[in-house]
Amino acid sequence: MAIALIATFAYLLGWSQIFTVKTIEVLGSPNALSEVDILKMSQVKIGGQLARVNTQATKENIQEIRWVRDVDISRNWIDGKVQLSVLARDPIAYFNIDQVEGQTIDNQGELFVLPGFSNPELPVISAATSAGALEANDLFTAFPADFRRSITSMVATASSSFLLNAKLKGRNIKIRWGDSAEMNLKISVIDRLLALPENKKITLIDLLAPHAPIVR
């Protein structure tokens, strides 16, 4: 009797049309285009058996999408709903878009292209070499959030040397940043220089020697 009940239950879960996927819901997807990516990578199909939806495998499939930061999968045995909840990465800058169209980075330094995403207010980071790109990425994501938001573009001009364009106190300022050392000191120097009345018309700050900055 017990064996028969187990066999019947196994049949209902694995083969019967009672416990099938009736709806698939995507939560947290930034837009319709990115939702298509989620559905495709999940490999979950309407009409498929709920018992055969491997939540761990589905999660791993979706996490292959670069713009996905985290994902959670759930099944509802009563209404047949499979819910795909994703946490998308938040772009903080465009990165080498001349090489990869629409490529962005987040505050963890991850590179990704978010389908359908466009934000002309995001800064643009450029680097000629892969090493320069990694260093630019590390420096940019290490900046304090308020200073990072002031940057409109960033270029790795040479090995460990960077040029910034920023909007500071309502002014467009070009900053020869130098290497990534003494970040807090350099930001403090910028603030002090811009506060001086005699510097109200400057457009360039050279921080190659932060203890002896040059303004023009």
Where are these regions (language model features)?
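Charged, solvent-exposed interaction patches on well-folded alpha/beta domains
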Residues: 1-14, 19-22, 35-36, 40-49, ...
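Short helix-loop capping/hinge motifs at secondary-structure junctions, enriched
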Residues: 31-33
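Glycine-centered tight turns that cap/initiate beta-strands
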Residues: 67-70
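Extended, alpha-helix-rich binding/interface surfaces that flank or overlap catalytic cores
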Residues: 26
